[in-house]
Amino acid sequence: MFLLPRFILVSCIIGSLGFYNPPTNVVSHVNGDWFLFGDSRSDCNHIVNINPHNYSYMDLNPVLCDSGKISSKAGNSIFRSFHFTDFYNYTGEGQQIIFYEGVNFTPYHAFKCNRSGSNDIWMQNKGLFYTQVYKNMAVYRSLTFVNVPYVYNGSAQSTALCKSGSLVLNNPAYIAPQANSGDYYYKVEADFYLSGCDEYIVPLCIFNGKFLSNTKYYDDSQYYFNKDTGVIYGLNSTETITTGFDLNCYYLVLPSGNYLAISNELLLTVPTKAICLNKRKDFTPVQVVDSRWNNARQSDNMTAVACQPPYCYFRNSTTNYVGVYDINHGDAGFTSILSGLLYNSPCFSQQGVFRYDNVSSVWPLYPYGRCPTAADINNPDLPICVYDPLPVILLGILLGVAVIIIVVLLLYFMVDNGTRLHDA
């Protein structure tokens, strides 16, 4: 055991010379069972629509284009497809899920339902939406979109109540009052059905203030009732504001079943699209790469707010996004982050990805996978190391055996050489 302190000292010296195995700022995977959701920065098919035709607009290495592990669409995002007519059917499956999208719905787009609305509320909606997506994709393998069929027995049609620029809200649908309704005080219902998935993410939205019509103010009131279980989900507007009047959305995770959408005032809303969650898996944190513009455009931090441990690891560049194709496409820092998809890594943590599973100078926080056993270098000036004792002891024994073998061999050759000299 006299070798053990020496071995620890040698280990510390090695660590002080640079063998730290530090966490790296990349997204990666432990094996080939992974999937990436993205936008133009990982959309390999977008090359046919751009000039010049080259892959420098992507942050993704083109080697991965034929992997079959990417669902990306230029100009879109999962949130944008979920709520608006500008739709792309994001679909993918994997044990390890990576997200690099969200920039196509930011304060730069300035969406709000009406002139007196508030884009801040839509940024809040975005954060709440991605929180549900990230949490659930840590326990589900498969994500896709499904249409939600509904039946409304009245004659009124759905109306595009919320639109701004090229964005038109169609989820949830808004059904206007019947022609014979004297005002907005009325009860109305519609049936909708969820089937074919393990669970669904659906929107439940209400206006956050008072709606003025014909000198009267109305409060929003929306409910979903599960007719199979008797569970009711509902919201009533309680705010008195009349400016900044916009749509607050909550994102429910619901099982399959028959539902009733109910409104007691203002307008009836009913979901038309849902995130379909399928195939339960062992808990595996998702990885999210910050999705933002160059500083010349306004971005938000909602994906960072939504991505919290233990269900999510967030990766970001420390510098401004500056692309080589154009200012918003082909940034070196984000290309470096996505380069981790080219190889397997044994360990993931809040701090980053560890390339090796032996020792490290950093304790992995919220670890996943086969992670290093080293704990910490407690003093930056004096390399005082704390290691998991088992591998240290085993390595010490191996080192001791090696030293004994070397000593025996040296003695053997010394004795053999002495014998030869004596014989001479």
UniProtKB/Swiss-Prot annotation:
It catalyses: N-acetyl-9-O-acetylneuraminate + H2O = N-acetylneuraminate + acetate + H(+); N-acetyl-4-O-acetylneuraminate + H2O = N-acetylneuraminate + acetate + H(+). The active site is at S40, D326, H329. It is an enzyme of class 3 (hydrolase). One of its GO terms (molecular function) is sialate 9-O-acetylesterase activity. Pfam families: Hema_esterase, Hema_HEFG. Structural protein that makes short spikes at the surface of the virus. Contains receptor binding and receptor-destroying activities. Mediates de-O-acetylation of N-acetyl-4-O-acetylneuraminic acid, which is probably the receptor determinant recognized by the virus on the surface of erythrocytes and susceptible cells. This receptor-destroying activity is important for virus release as it probably helps preventing self-aggregation and ensures the efficient spread of the progeny virus from cell to cell. The keyword Membrane applies. This is Hemagglutinin-esterase. Residues 1-16 form the signal peptide. Residues 7-127 are annotated as: Esterase domain 1. Residues 128-266 are annotated as: Receptor binding. InterPro entries: Capsid_hemagglutn (IPR008980), HEMA (IPR042545), Hemagglutn-estrase_core (IPR007142), Hemagglutn-estrase_hemagglutn (IPR003860). Residues 267-379 are annotated as: Esterase domain 2. Glycans are attached at N54, N89, N114, N153, N236, N301, N316, N358, N417. Residues 414-424 are intravirion. Its EC number is 3.1.1.53.
